[in-house]
Amino acid sequence: MTVSLDGDYYVRFIVRNVESSAGRRHGLVYSLTLHGPDKGILGFDNAHPVPPRKRDEPHDHLHVGDTVKPYDYTNAGALLQDFWTAVYSLLHERGLT
């Protein structure tokens, strides 16, 4: 699902159920992203492990610009809240809220 925000900004959600595994213990593959006029700005996803995590540890992580760091997934509600909090913070920094 893609939702247009203000001007050239939009968010995209891709979520699907999968069998639970070491990397996706909650049984979801997800990608929640904020895009701007030139590129992706923010993303929460679990497509792959992120150092220092190993392949058999949770794949959940956060991208802010070119920085990637582990994200501590607790539940879907907290993920959505954390995502929207980060979106509004970044849009505010850019003078869009």
Where does each model-flagged region fall?
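The feature represents the first ordered module of a protein
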Residues: 1-58
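Short linear sequence elements within intrinsically disordered, low-complexity coil regions
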Residues: 18, 35, 49, 64-66, ...
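Solvent-exposed, non-transmembrane amphipathic alpha-helical segments
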Residues: 52, 61-64, 96
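Short helix/strand-capping connector loops at secondary-structure junctions
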Residues: 57-71
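Short, compact, well-ordered microdomains
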Residues: 67-97
